[in-house]
């Protein structure tokens, strides 16, 4: 999907819709009820577009306030490997795109022990170990959550489809762009270094 960013609300809605960001699941948790706007004939929930856009902006502001160098973005999903690497490259944070080793945030004796001030995860269930350790260490957590996720340990929820490769690419592209716009490094009416296609994992085997 090759796109040129515009601040126009209609354009943004089209981008979110075509990328599948707003596609939920057929399960709704009490935590995600507030972010659901509709249900399609198959019983699949639709996530609220305005809420998604608003939370992406809030997350970007949180990241910039904390400092991207203090952020770790991680995911145990194969489909998220390219999106989080591109995101980390653009905003200047650290990424963990393979297995999250227990103790990474809580055991100073580990060689790869880290002390971030903020954590970003793609799925609070898949990335439960990272979320648990961050919570125990007092580290705030930003999480992308679908309609069936439990979000009780997330400080900032980005309601979005966290399953689809295209959706993950779009989410991280939008979030990276928003961070760069806040910094003044990108003009919101012009293309940036990468397009959404560049953020998508084409083949989950490519990182193996």
UniProtKB/Swiss-Prot annotation:
Q: Which domain of life is it from?
A: Archaea
Q: State a GO cellular component annotated for this protein.
A: small ribosomal subunit
The disulfides recorded in the entry are none
What is the protein's name according to its record?
Small ribosomal subunit protein uS2
Alphabetized UniProt keyword annotations: Ribonucleoprotein, Ribosomal protein
Which processes are annotated in GO (biological process)? translation
Q: What does the record list as coiled-coil region(s)? A: none
**One GO MF term:** structural constituent of ribosome
| Xref: SUPFAM superfamilies | Ribosomal protein S2
Entry-linked InterPro entries: Ribosomal_uS2, Ribosomal_uS2_arc, Ribosomal_uS2_CS, Ribosomal_uS2_euk/arc, Ribosomal_uS2_flav_dom_sf
Q: Which family does it belong to?
A: Belongs to the universal ribosomal protein uS2 family.
Q: Does the keyword Ribosomal protein apply?
A: yes
Question: Is Ubl conjugation one of the keywords?
Answer: no
The source organism is Cenarchaeum symbiosum (strain A)
């Amino acid at each position: 999907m090759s796109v040129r960013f515009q601040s126009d609300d209609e354009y943004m809605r089209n981008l979110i819709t075509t990328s599948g960001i707003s596609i939920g699941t057929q399960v709704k948790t009490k935590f995600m009820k507030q972010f659901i706007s509709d249900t399609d004939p198959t019983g699949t929930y639709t996530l609220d577009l305005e809420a998604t856009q608003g939370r992406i902006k809030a997350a970007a502001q949180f990241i910039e306030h904390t400092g991207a160098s203090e952020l770790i973005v991680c995911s145990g999903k194969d489909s998220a490997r390219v999106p989080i690497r591109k995101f980390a490259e653009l905003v200047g944070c650290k990424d963990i795109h393979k297995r999250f080793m227990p103790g990474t945030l809580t055991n100073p004796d580990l060689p790869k022990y880290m002390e971030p001030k903020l954590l970003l995860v793609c799925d609070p269930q898949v990335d439960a170990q990272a979320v648990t350790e961050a919570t125990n260490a007092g580290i705030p957590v930003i999480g992308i959550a679908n309609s069936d996720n439990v979000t009780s340990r997330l400080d900032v929820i980005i309601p979005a489809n966290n399953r689809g490769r295209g959706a993950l690419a779009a989410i991280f592209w939008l979030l990276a762009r928003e961070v760069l716009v806040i910094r003044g490094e990108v003009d919101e009416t012009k293309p940036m270094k990468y397009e959404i296609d560049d953020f998508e994992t084409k083949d989950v085997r490519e990182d193996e």
